[in-house]
UniProtKB/Swiss-Prot annotation:
Residues 1-24 form the signal peptide. Belongs to the somatotropin/prolactin family. The keyword Zinc does not apply. Glycans are attached at N145. This is Somatolactin-2. InterPro entries: 4_helix_cytokine-like_core, Somatotropin/Prolactin, Somatotropin_CS. The keyword Nucleotide-binding does not apply. GO terms for cellular component: extracellular space. Pituitary gland.
Length: 231
């Protein structure tokens, strides 16, 4: 039954995948020399709209990836224990507001820098995830394609947010000084179940943070229109 649900989800994903690719507006800001010279020609309003659309798609595809991974590899009893597996989210230590009241109180500057911190913190872990998924027997191509797509789009999102910071705040690119040692440390040869739970936690945490990126960017957009009615 679980396998049939996963297959059906995969079929729907295959049907929707071309739509996602064709409706996604490009956000590649880098020129041939690697500089961020393309996006500055876009208006601030349009650039923010593109950044928000990218964040929405990243969250949607991360949600689909997490569900597909869960259906394929996680027995139901372990789904209930995923938060007790000893793998905290890698962005837990970042100084990013989490409650609704905290988010509403922070400045536009901190909204943008919070999004950038989240984006930068997940670029390497998603590359790492693509390598670990190759250990699995029978991993569907759809899952591999989705994680690769999200990884690529996350780097584009970083570029877009960096240009937004330059446009709105007249500041340079900030890099996150966050150590991922806990995620990438060598544990010898852990059991396959440990790999599975670690990757499941990684996907679940990224889905949560991708949603937070979307929320923060939409709040920023709302403030640009009418700061008094944003919730």
């Amino acid at each position: 039954m679980r396998m049939m649900r996963a297959i059906k989800q995969g079929q729907w994903a295959i049907l929707l995948w071309p739509y996602l690719l064709t409706t996604s507006i490009p956000l590649d800001c880098r020129d041939e020399q690697g500089g961020l010279s393309r996006c500055p020609s876009i208006s601030q309003e349009k650039l923010l709209d593109r950044v928000i659309q990218h964040a929405e798609l990243i969250y949607r595809v991360s949600e689909e990836s997490c569900s597909l991974f869960e259906e394929m590899f996680i027995p139901f009893p372990l789904q209930l224990q995923r938060n007790q597996a000893g793998y905290p989210c890698i962005t837990k230590a970042l100084p990013i507001p989490s409650s609704k009241s905290e988010i509403q109180q922070i400045s536009d500057k901190w909204l943008l820098h919070s999004v950038l911190m989240l984006v930068q913190s997940w670029i390497e872990p998603l590359v790492y995830l693509q390598t670990t998924l190759n250990r699995y027997d029978g991993v569907p191509d759809m899952l591999l394609n989705k994680t690769k797509w999200v990884s690529d789009k996350l780097m584009s999102l970083e570029q877009g947010v960096a240009v937004l910071i330059k446009k709105m705040l007249d500041e340079g690119l900030m890099t996150t000084t966050y150590s991922e040692q806990g995620l990438f440390q060598d544990d010898g040869q852990p059991e396959m179940l440990e790999y599975v739970m670690r990757d499941y936690t990684l996907l679940s945490c990224f889905k949560k943070d991708a949603h937070k990126m979307e929320i923060l960017l939409k709040l920023l957009k709302c403030r640009q229109n009418d700061i008094h009615s944003c919730a």
